[in-house]
Amino acid sequence: MKRFKNILMASALLCGAFFTACDNNDDKPVFPENQDQAYDMSGFAKGADVSWLTEMEKEGYKFYDAEGNGHECMSLLRDLGMNAIRLRVWVNPDQGWSEEEGFFNPEGWCDKDDVVTKAWRAHNLGYRIMIDFHYSDIWADPGRQEKPAAWADLSFDELKQAVADH
């Protein structure tokens, strides 16, 4: 009996789907009257993550336009239409890295001072600035959420204050 009900229910669903698909509807799609309407896209962010820029510059990287002319990276990106910059900040990036893991950051790239330097450069060029807070000393993602070494033994209230201060 239960099997019969299941077969009957499946048949009813298939018939319902079949009959709705067989509609003889000749309606044409309706389009807005003014297809040439321009939309204001100025509120959208068109940007890049330049978190490693200061390190790349120190290592001697150069940035060029399509004609081969050298430019400062953030100016070049602005000239290409970017209006926002994303910057990653770690708590103490020189503490969370090791050569054994393949990560080594003795100069503390992406710490508060480094990020503030890049943020001021971006601000002076008219960029919108997006700060990506990593509440860790190194990469934080869903698979790896390590507290900064300096915060490891803090109570919950102390941890909340450390996050707010950061």
Segments and roles (model prediction):
Residues 10-17:
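Bacterial N-terminal signal peptides
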Residues 31-76:
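Boundary/entry segment of secreted carbohydrate-active catalytic domains
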Residues 1-8:
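Bacterial N-terminal signal peptides that target proteins for export
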Residues 76-166:
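Substrate-binding cleft and catalytic face of glycoside hydrolase catalytic domains
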Residues 14, 45, 116-119:
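Hydrophobic alpha-helical segments
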Residues 17-37:
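Bacterial Sec-dependent N-terminal signal peptides
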